[in-house]
């Protein structure tokens, strides 16, 4: 099993599946925004950036997955993006489940001055929605609740693959 996990992270197919899943999420977000007219909020924009981190990790892992430093750079980016995305999605769910004037998201995104993405790419990163408003549901779950599940799966798979690449078994000594 350890050898399988080690081998799977060294193949482009696994990394391309990771990138494809994140690309699907990004394209879905743009569909919801531009076709269905659902405006993204500040937390939605941050969750998009976390998803872009997973997408970038998948693309980086596809470059040269046999090289340990490329593979581990991609793994660390994947894990940190999945963790950050899960943390953001949980906070977003809290805004929706416990609406309060004291529990609200910021009115604007807080990008660094050297990368104002909301000004450079406003069609993707400009927030004009309300974090506490539930505008869409599927199977009685809101979009942030689905993102909690998605980022939790990303994080779980990351942990399994990372452990498989850390542990030295009899097969690999």
UniProtKB/Swiss-Prot annotation:
GO molecular function, one term: protein-disulfide reductase activity
SS bond partners: 41-44, 105-131
TM stretches of this protein: 15-31, 50-65, 73-90, 146-164
One Pfam family from the record: DsbB
InterPro entries, A to Z: DiS_bond_form_DsbB/BdbC, Disulphide_bond_form_DsbB, DsbB, DsbB-like_sf
GO biological process: protein folding
Subcellular location: Cell inner membrane
UniProt KW Disulfide bond keyword: yes
Function: Required for disulfide bond formation in some periplasmic proteins. Acts by oxidizing the DsbA protein.
Protein name as it appears in the record: Disulfide bond formation protein B
Record organism: Aeromonas hydrophila subsp. hydrophila (strain ATCC 7966 / DSM 30187 / BCRC 13018 / CCUG 14551 / JCM 1027 / KCTC 2358 / NCIMB 9240 / NCTC 8049)
């Amino acid at each position: 099993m350890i050898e399988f996990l080690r081998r799977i992270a060294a193949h482009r197919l696994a990394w391309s599946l990771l990138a494809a899943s994140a690309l699907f999420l990004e394209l879905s977000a743009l569909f919801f925004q531009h076709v269905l007219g659902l405006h993204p909020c500040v937390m939605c924009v941050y969750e998009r950036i976390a998803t872009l981190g997973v997408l970038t990790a998948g693309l980086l892992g596809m470059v040269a997955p046999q090289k340990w430093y490329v593979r581990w750079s991609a793994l660390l980016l994947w894990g940190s993006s999945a963790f950050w995305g899960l943390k953001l999605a949980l906070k977003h769910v809290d805004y929706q489940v416990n609406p309060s004037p004291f529990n609200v998201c910021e009115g604007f995104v807080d990008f660094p001055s050297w990368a104002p993405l909301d000004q450079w790419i406003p069609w993707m990163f400009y927030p004009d929605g309300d974090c506490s408003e539930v505008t869409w549901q599927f199977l009685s779950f809101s979009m942030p609740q689905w993102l909690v599940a998605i980022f939790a799966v990303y994080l779980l798979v990351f942990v399994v693959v990372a452990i498989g690449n850390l542990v030295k078994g009899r097969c690999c000594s």
